[in-house]
Amino acid sequence: MTTLAIDIGGTKLAAALIGADGQIRDRRELPTPASQTPQALRDALSALVSPLQAHAQRVAIASTGIIRDGSLLALNPHNLGGLLHFPLVKTLEQLTNLPTIAINDAQAAAWAEYQALDGDITDMVFITVSTGVGGGVVSGGKLRTGPGGLAGHIGHTLADPHGPACGCGRTGCVEAIASGRGIATAAQGELAGANAKTIFTRAGQGDEQAQQLIHRSARTLARLIADIKATTDCQCVVVGGSVGLAEGYLALVETYLAQEPAAFHVDLLAAHYRHDAGLLGAALLAQGEIL
């Protein structure tokens, strides 16, 4: 059976057909609508899936935000242009006439990445550092989503009580500092207005402010990982996302994690499925692995 998998992120929408063998084909991408209207997202999703839906028997969605009762509830509305609520499952069922499931994108990615690990690992945490910071937890070989879908939203744990305001309504969240948006927002002077990709490029060219912003992000993530180790006693942490997979970033995180007491050290791995983990994880879940 072929699954039409969809990944809804802060900057892009992706879709692909995934067979029972896990092979990804006919992958497509569109920019996430800047408009905060549900109709704009519906129209973009329609354009994304229309060339693929005739070849699938079901739909699986991995989306940023909290997924509850088939709807997207934005914990940080800024990540979707201000959109607060969207009926994901209902919309895709109407667009495709196919049975549909939905799950948080980082939770889906965690499940895909778990499948790629050695068989003796039963407890792991996945962290995505991209437009925002998200996560997924596998404990005892099972994906933990929580009764309300909130489990794994580790980007909204406290990093600095005097830090910047976060779009979730809290102050000093990891996401507000370590994410691509957080890196860009903190840029000043000639870097003001630059996005995270540009800041990474400038850091590689020796720009001191750009390097400091990236180190600040990596240091914040390392402290989060130490907290995760203390909370879950996980066997490894897998890091993905456009920032998490940027050249040299994970090595910086490892350097800062090594400065923590040994009890909080944990193996760090780059995401095996790179930017396709959310798509693949959603498809695996649709095959009945968990949901």
UniProtKB/Swiss-Prot annotation:
Keywords: ATP-binding, Carbohydrate metabolism, Kinase, Metal-binding, Nucleotide-binding, Transferase, Zinc. InterPro entries: ATPase_NBD (IPR043129), ManNAc_kinase_bac (IPR023945), ROK (IPR000600), ROK_cs (IPR049874). Pathway: Amino-sugar metabolism; N-acetylneuraminate degradation; D-fructose 6-phosphate from N-acetylneuraminate: step 2/5. ATP binds at residues 5-12, 132-139. One of its GO terms (molecular function) is N-acylmannosamine kinase activity. GO terms for biological process: N-acetylneuraminate catabolic process. It catalyses: an N-acyl-D-mannosamine + ATP = an N-acyl-D-mannosamine 6-phosphate + ADP + H(+). Pfam families: ROK. It is an enzyme of class 2 (transferase). Zn(2+) binds at H156, C166, C168, C173. It comes from the Bacteria. Its EC number is 2.7.1.60. Belongs to the ROK (NagC/XylR) family. NanK subfamily. Catalyzes the phosphorylation of N-acetylmannosamine (ManNAc) to ManNAc-6-P. HAMAP family: ManNAc_kinase. Homodimer. This is N-acetylmannosamine kinase. The gene is nanK.
